[in-house]
Curated annotation (Swiss-Prot):
EC number: 1.1.1.262
Similarity remark: Belongs to the PdxA family.
Gene Ontology cellular-component terms listed: cytoplasm
Source organism of the structure: Helicobacter pylori (strain J99 / ATCC 700824) (Campylobacter pylori J99)
HAMAP family linked to this entry: PdxA_Epsilonprot (MF_02086)
Example GO molecular function: cobalt ion binding
Physiological role: Catalyzes the NAD(P)-dependent oxidation of 4-(phosphooxy)-L-threonine (HTP) into 2-amino-3-oxo-4-(phosphooxy)butyric acid which spontaneously decarboxylates to form 3-amino-2-oxopropyl phosphate (AHAP).
Annotated positions binding substrate: H126, T127, K259, N268, R277
The keyword Phosphoprotein is annotated on this UniProt entry: no
Matches recorded under InterPro entries: PdxA_epsilonprot, PdxA_fam
Name assigned to this protein: 4-hydroxythreonine-4-phosphate dehydrogenase
Keyword set includes NADP: yes
Amino acid sequence: MAKKKIAISCGDIQGVGLELILKSHKEVSALCEPLYLVHSELLERANQLLDNAYETKTLNAIAIDAPLPLLNSSTIGKVSTQSGAYSFESFKKACELADSKEVDGICTLPINKLAWQQAQIPFVGHTDFLKQRYKDHQIIMMLGCSKLFVGLFSDHVPLSAVSQLIQVKALVKFLLAFQKSTQAKIVQVCGFNPHAGEEGLFGEEDEKILKAIQESNQTLGFECFLGPLPADSAFAPNKRKITPFYVSMSHDVGLAPLKALYFDESINVSLNAPILRASTDHGTAFDIAYQNKANHKSYLNAIKYLA
């Protein structure tokens, strides 16, 4: 069977993205046919910063339509407008290749959201861009590994805005889309307020969540969704024995326990997108950039998911 062709966007070159590409190429190329969306000159510069520890000539790198950012000992680990613009163009090119079926999927290495903002990129991050590009699809950010998956009802929005987003109709649409994509038989849904609202004592959001769960289960014809569960105990060991699938109303409530348990191996997946996309479950790691310290387990797991 032919290996799948996977486009790999470089992420922010001032972080660990290029190190991950270089140090993982042998293992990645055993899993798929990687297509790196980055100028070969940047890979060579990255290798020099890494004491020429890796082979660069065998990598299939495609120059993207963007000016080369500076990459040297003075720029690494710092927010750069040029690097933000470059990482966006690399990502956009990956999507274009997937849309045209020139690749089977895309793997996105971590970007810096502030660098995107400084480069006047009108999207908060990868998922926000995908939601705008594929508006007819209910795209869901799910992070995890085989032991635990968390779907986020809201992702990169201020916590103060989440309450207004929790509406029965929107949540039913989300829950049904999540179940359809994952084919999960049981999904535990975290509550929003302390003690999942204590029957309305702490806000009305959890009553809406309960109603959405009931309507979703009725539509499915079986009791798929459980909850809302008090979020402070939802990820206890006895709860995780029930199912690996969870839904969280907000970003940190779901991802704090996931990353505490499985940070190195988890990945980020875009459910319901018309293209196959996975990413690492970590950021640019500016603090260890070009120190040969980057853990590539999450990156390899993302490639395995796509391949």
